[in-house]
Amino acid sequence: MVCVGIDVAKDKHDCFIISSEGEILADVFTIPNNAEGFDTLLQAIRRSTRPEDKIKVGLEATGHYSYNILGFLLDKGLPTYVINPLHTNLYRKSLSLRKTKTDRVDARTIAAMLMSDVDLKSYTDTAYH
């Protein structure tokens, strides 16, 4: 399995790709919050995986800043998990006593959460009437 952690921000996203064995496939890299950046992310995922690999992509729920990348990932058929920022914060604190909070650390934390949390449910765009 390959896990992709994305820390979403207004103008840019920090991304991190790791295998379930703990091998870093792509250390933290930054993409712009636009179609070109999303294509760069998709290329990095494809370079880091084999066709038989199961892929999980996780990002924090950050309101409207995450809508475009979330839509892109879903359109590409990637299982995507939208994680409550409170859970990310608590998970990060459980891993370290340091008060380290950076976008780079968050991207790694989100990927680690995907590897360890079997209770996460992938995002579905369901409308109820």
Which residue stretches match the model-derived regions?
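Phosphate- and other anionic-substrate recognition elements at nucleic-acid/protein interfaces
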Residues: M1-H129
